[in-house]
């Protein structure tokens, strides 16, 4: 076995080199531009999500046989979750498999108004047409499942956005805002879908913000040390940090990956770092994706984010400062332990005996 002191020495040397490079990168950056989120605003904030809730049913057996169960809902009071079951992994020869997937997607398009309206608004004739659904969806169950989940989520966001636009047109003086749990992109569709997607939501005249719970950007040591060096965490109250991407471009960072840019074909937003949590010394920041059509208007952006901060939770779920609308809609669609128990028992009673025996043989 290699001498422990030698291992320690090698690791220490590499860590020292990495730390030196990180500090040099931080020293080359200008101070962050901090904007306090203290604007007056009255917002009607709504969120919408789609989640695959079938992964835990029957100990994951449904997932193993290729069945996805999606729950789709918005945070609006009277909007109950809607379920979609889909066979994402038909064990068939390649040509038959493709035909089955096409037939099921055609059926979804013809029977579901939510999906049909979104597909029509995007200018698609088929869900699986070229330059929309990736070829990997025919060979990979996770790829098809992820594509469908995002399709349903964006369709729901569009439906809610249209309703909010109608309310805005009444002239109530209350600004509607849409929230998405994630970046502003259709990440599991073909490249190029996001530009028309951004144009569609821009046409609604209802701002949309992407707020992922976690971000690779905020875990980057350069960003963490940069914020610490200039006392950002010690600031009191909600705040936003605008990012001068040219500084990071000079460091060799790929802007599209970390921040988004106006030429991006894979998303239609750009990051700002935002803390909704009002407590000083809080490190609970979010990388908020702000649409390209909004981020150039700093005053409007600050008004919207100030309103979101006013309606953010101070609890620890999932992190302090998480917007209440997103928490509310997640609570709607996630199956509690009691609901899982009731649903599993209901399925046991309703499926034909031969199907139950089949699932039981798989470990049900």
For every predicted segment, state its role.
Residues 1-46, 53, 58, 85, ...:
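Long, contiguous domain-sized segments
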Residues 40-81:
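An N-terminal structural lobe/cap that precedes and organizes the functional/catalytic core
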Residues 69-100:
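A generic, well-ordered mixed alpha/beta core segment in the N-terminal half of proteins
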């Amino acid at each position: 076995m290699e001498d422990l002191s030698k291992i320690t020495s090698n690791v220490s040397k590499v860590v020292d080199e990495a730390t030196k490079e990180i500090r040099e990168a931080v020293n080359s950056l200008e101070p962050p531009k901090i904007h306090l989120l203290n604007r007056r605003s009255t917002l009607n904030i709504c969120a919408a999500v789609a989640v695959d809730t079938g992964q835990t049913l029957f100990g994951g057996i449904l997932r193993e046989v290729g069945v996805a169960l999606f729950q789709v809902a918005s945070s609006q009071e009277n909007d109950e979750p809607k379920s979609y079951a889909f066979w994402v992994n038909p064990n068939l020869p390649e040509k038959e498999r493709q035909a089955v997937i096409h037939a099921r997607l055609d059926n979804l398009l013809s029977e579901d108004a939510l999906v049909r309206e979104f597909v029509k608004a995007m200018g698609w004739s088929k869900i699986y047409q070229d330059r929309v659904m990736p070829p990997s969806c025919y060979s990979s169950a996770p790829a098809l499942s992820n594509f469908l989940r995002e399709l349903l989520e964006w369709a729901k966001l569009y439906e809610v956005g249209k309703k909010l636009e109608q309310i805005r047109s009444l002239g109530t003086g209350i600004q509607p805002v849409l929230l998405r749990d994630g970046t502003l992109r259709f990440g599991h569709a073909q490249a190029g879908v996001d530009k028309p997607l951004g144009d569609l939501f821009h046409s609604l005249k209802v701002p949309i913000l992407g707020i992922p719970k976690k971000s690779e950007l905020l875990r980057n040591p350069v960003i963490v040390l940069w914020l610490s060096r200039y006392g950002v965490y010690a600031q009191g109250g909600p705040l936003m940090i605008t990012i001068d991407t040219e500084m990071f471009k000079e460091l060799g960072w790929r802007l599209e990956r970390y921040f988004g840019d106006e030429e991006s074909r894979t998303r239609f937003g750009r990051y700002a770092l935002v803390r909704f949590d009002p407590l000083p010394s809080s490190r609970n920041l979010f990388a908020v994706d702000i649409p390209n059509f909004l981020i150039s208007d700093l005053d409007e952006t600050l008004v919207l984010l100030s309103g979101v901060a006013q309606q953010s939770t101070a609890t620890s779920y999932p992190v302090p400062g998480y917007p209440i609308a997103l928490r509310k809609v997640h609570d709607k669609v996630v199956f509690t332990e009691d609901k899982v128990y009731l649903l599993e028992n209901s399925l046991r009673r309703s499926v034909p005996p031969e199907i139950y025996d089949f699932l039981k043989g798989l470990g049900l």
